[in-house]
């Protein structure tokens, strides 16, 4: 089964431009201003495995502006990873501040999740933010309780691409889930180092 990118990924790109967190066009920009990258290059740079989870080649969904992949492990752990171009009015743009853009992107993910909860008459999530650095790359993350387990997501910026990953397992210890997300980020960061 092919995974479809959630609609909020495109919304997040447009909203970032609307609040002024993205600034330079990907055409003719100097390396000091922004580093546009090919979305396919980001996808191809991903490792074949993340700890025990192996990349599922049948899970990939990709177009010129976005992609999604899924890593699966035998113990039912899954990591879904989504990449999407920052855009403004249909054109690729790079963040003026990649860290601020990643933080804002995370806020927009929260907004989207809370809107989904509201549509289903459920309360808003109680997010616990955390952040970390791996191989000089900053990751902005959140953990929140869902029934008896803990959900987590992290965002980083690679050139003009927002890279977002989720951990899917029945983890109940927030500290353990946070550590697992940091371990995943530590594996991803070196693979992305030469892209931006």
Model-found features: residue ranges?
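Bacterial N-terminal signal peptides that target proteins for export
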Residues: 1-12
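C-terminal motif of bacterial Sec signal peptides marking the signal peptidase cleavage site
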Residues: 19-23
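A small/polar (G/S/T-enriched), proline-flanked helix-loop surface module common
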Residues: 28-196
